């Protein structure tokens, strides 16, 4: 099993709290490789916290929210390298836990080989779209929430997914993020 983790982080001062290192300590046990993408500042304390788990730390302008942080990591690897992984986990610093070892979840989900992608939680959608401004739909579809999404290798190899990420427009707001990514 070869699994890449992409961890998105934002905190206005760039400081990493203990709940994040607690999460990463367990997550990292299930990864072959980890890249951390920080939008904005990363303090010396924050860098030291992440360096416990990886030297692959990208600090970038705070632009494009989580979507463009993930895109930055994907672009840094390129599709040829990304397709070498059995799974790619995209997650962020809005999760707390785990309460139980993540290995249990990863093992259970790996048994279901019919999945091209999966996530930790879903939003159940709405008949009308609660977001103002740009809309792709007049309703809010049921969707996997962006704080934890896993892509399987065959999905990463799909030209449709590669095209989706290669042509992802700049994300300007939370609404854009939900509408175009989740």
How would you name each of these model-derived features?
Residues 97-133:
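Conserved donor-nucleotide/metal-binding helix-loop-beta segment in metal-dependent transferases, i.e.
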Residues 17-24, 102-106, 176-182:
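Well-ordered, non-membrane alpha-helical segments in soluble/globular domains
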Residues 117-121, 138-182:
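Catalytic core and acceptor-binding pocket of nucleotide-sugar-dependent glycosyltransferases
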Residues 64, 68, 96-98:
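A short, conserved beta-strand element in the Rossmann-like catalytic core
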Residues 1-65, 75-87:
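N-terminal anchoring/stem segment of glycosyltransferases
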Residues 10-15, 41-42, 95-98, 125, ...:
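Short acidic, S/G/P-rich loop/turn micro-motifs used as interaction or catalytic elements
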């Amino acid at each position: 099993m070869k699994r890449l983790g992409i961890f998105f982080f934002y905190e206005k001062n760039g400081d990493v709290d203990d709940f994040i290192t607690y999460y990463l300590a367990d997550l990292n046990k299930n990864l072959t490789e980890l890249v951390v993408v920080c939008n904005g500042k990363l303090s010396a304390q924050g860098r030291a916290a992440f360096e416990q788990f990886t030297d692959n730390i990208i600090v970038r302008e705070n632009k494009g929210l989580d979507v463009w942080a993930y895109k930055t990591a994907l672009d840094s690897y390129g599709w040829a390298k990304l397709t070498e992984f059995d799974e790619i986990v995209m997650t962020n610093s809005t999760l707390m836990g785990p309460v139980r070892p993540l290995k249990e979840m990863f093992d259970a989900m790996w048994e279901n080989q019919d999945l091209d992608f999966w996530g930790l939680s879903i939003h159940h959608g709405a008949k009308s779209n609660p977001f103002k401004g740009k809309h792709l739909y007049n309703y809010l579809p049921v969707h996997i929430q962006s704080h934890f999404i896993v892509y399987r290798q065959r999905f990463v190899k799909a030209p449709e997914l590669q095209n989706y990420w290669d042509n992802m427009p700049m994300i300007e707001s939370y609404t854009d993020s939900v509408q175009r990514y989740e």
